[in-house]
Amino acid sequence: MIYPLLDHPRAATADISSLETLFYGASPMSPTRLKEGVEKWGQIFFQCFGQSEAPMALTHLKKADHDLSKPERFASCGRPSPWVHLALLGDDNQPVPEGEAGEICVRAPLVMEGYNGLPEQTEAAFAGGWLHTGDVGRYDDEGFLHIVDRKKDMIVTGGFNVFPREIEDVISAHPAVAQVAVVGVPDERWGEAVKAVVILRPGHEASEALAGELQVAVKEAKGSVQAPKSVDFVASIPLSALGKPDKKALRKQFWGDQARGVN
């Protein structure tokens, strides 16, 4: 919802002085677009991160944290909320080394007791005594949590693990890009190849040259492994019932009936 508001012709001139707080969450927001919002409307943004299995805010990024002098925070989901204990765990359910990415796991009074009538799923969700969120994250030096990506959205290409969120953040910084989703698609050589699906801002046209610019931007920022092998320009990206980019539906467009299980 915020992106169309930012792109509205009156976004920079309309009187929004009565709007004191704008909560956002549910899916990652482009740091570039968030910065654009703060520049236009001020520090009215407040982010909450959570999930249905722990139905309150696990972390929060306060309005004051949306500081234009500290742009790295715009990629963060904030610090843990009171009474919430978070840990970044590896596949062995042990804490990962400081500075590394791991699955965000939680212990707190707000955590569910389990899935009704689904003992196996409940056991898996609470492996090691923690609720596993399915999100991969890392902490920065100031204790702000950064969500790297959904664990199930990770792309394995040529034996390397690639997180789409990191690529999306680079591509969304391009002035022509309104929205982007990155998925893995079938590739005979690499198993999976990185594909970027892009919605352009009004006034910009799709071209091979623009696709090349986006690929080069990712290569320079993240490396050749992360650089998309292809870029598709589209009018819309499928959304879930909650309004999130539906990557399962997006992947299915490219995988079809192939053997790979679409998460």
Task: Kindly give the residue locations of the regions a language model identified.
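Gly/Ser/Thr-rich phosphate-binding loop
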Residues: L6-E72, H85, D92-P95
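Glycine-centered tight turns that cap/initiate beta-strands
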Residues: R10, S18, W83, A176-Q179, ...
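Beta-strand->loop->alpha-helix junctions that form or flank phosphate-binding loops
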Residues: F46-P55, G78-P80, V183-P186, D232
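Conserved ATP/PPi-binding loop(s) of AMP-dependent carboxylate-activating enzymes
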Residues: R79-W83, D92-A124, V162
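AMP-binding/adenylate-forming catalytic core of the ANL superfamily
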Residues: A108, E113-G114, Q121-A124, V136-Q226, ...
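Acidic/polar alpha-helix N-cap and adjacent early helical turns
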Residues: K252-N263
